[in-house]
């Protein structure tokens, strides 16, 4: 009996060691794998940053490599407008059809949440355009955007301090409801939707978005860069749609076929008819 016990105990020890090794290998990293954010003090650049925004320098190369090669969750530090960093666990989460993802491997999207407070969550993407994020942090919605003049220059700002386009470029229509009434209605609908979401299965809607030649040129002139801009747009829409409506938007596999690079040959006239198609 003693001899059998001596054989069994080492076997149990080996089995436990194997189990703990597997669990350790499956566990997400606890420490941030990217922390390279430093505040920029350039007066010229700060003057063009959003009010109360935070201008930062980074090295996008290691961050891009980390995210493009990630097959499982990674942890990175993201800059907050108040001057601090928060560690977020990012998990690959696509907003494009698999075929489109395979065709443009330099574009990846992620869902993520803060390690210290999982209620703070949002979505992030990496592409040739850089790193972009939109996430909830406490009572604020925070954005991280790349500045156009430098691949390694970024700004972190809250929604209330977002940069606003010139009013001259924004034709305005008379509101059908008073702002206070509309705000109360939206808050009520959002609250009701969040209560129902736990009982609702997430639905995916396939989406096709065309881009004019002007849009593509504005974002760098290539289909990949225009698609990357559309991916950032859809990724951010999904922050709201998934939370409030249990809806996931996904760009179709052939979406790049309707991204045009030349304003002179695209099928859009940029007249009121085109505007009607977008309303």
Per-region residue spans from a language model:
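N-terminal prosegments of processed precursors
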Residues: 25-152, 273-279
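Bacterial N-terminal signal peptides that target proteins for export
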Residues: 2-13
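Bacterial N-terminal signal peptides
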Residues: 11-22
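Fold-level signature of zinc-dependent metallopeptidase catalytic domains
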Residues: 28-56, 153-279
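Intrinsic-disorder/low-complexity regions
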Residues: 3-5, 144, 160
């Amino acid at each position: 009996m003693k001899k059998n016990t001596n054989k069994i105990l080492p076997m149990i020890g080996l089995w436990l060691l194997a189990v703990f090794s597997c669990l350790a290998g499956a566990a997400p990293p606890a420490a941030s794998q990217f922390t390279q954010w430093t505040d920029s003090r350039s007066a010229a650049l700060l003057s063009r940053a959003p009010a109360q925004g935070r201008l930062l320098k980074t090295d996008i190369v290691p961050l891009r490599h980390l995210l493009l090669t990630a097959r499982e969750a990674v942890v990175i530090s993201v800059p907050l407008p108040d001057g601090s960093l928060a560690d977020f666990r990012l998990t690959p989460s696509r907003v494009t059809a698999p075929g489109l993802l395979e065709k443009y491997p330099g574009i990846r999207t992620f869902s993520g949440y803060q390690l210290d407070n999982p209620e703070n969550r949002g979505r992030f993407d990496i592409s040739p355009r850089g790193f972009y994020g939109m996430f909830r942090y406490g009572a604020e919605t925070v954005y991280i955007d790349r500045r156009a003049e430098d691949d390694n220059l970024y700004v972190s700002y809250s929604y209330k301090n977002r940069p606003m386009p010139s009013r001259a470029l924004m034709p305005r229509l008379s509101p059908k409801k008073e702002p206070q009434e509309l705000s109360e209605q939206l808050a009520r609908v959002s609250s009701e939707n969040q209560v129902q979401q736990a009982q609702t299965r997430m639905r995916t809607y396939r989406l096709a978005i065309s881009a004019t030649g002007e849009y593509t040129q504005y974002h760098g002139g290539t289909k990949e860069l225009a698609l990357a801009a559309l991916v950032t747009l859809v990724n951010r829409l999904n922050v709201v749609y998934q939370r409030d409506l249990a809806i996931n938007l996904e760009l179709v596999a052939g979406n790049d076929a309707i991204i045009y690079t030349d304003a002179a040959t695209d099928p859009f006239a940029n007249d009121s008819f085109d505007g009607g198609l977008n309303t």
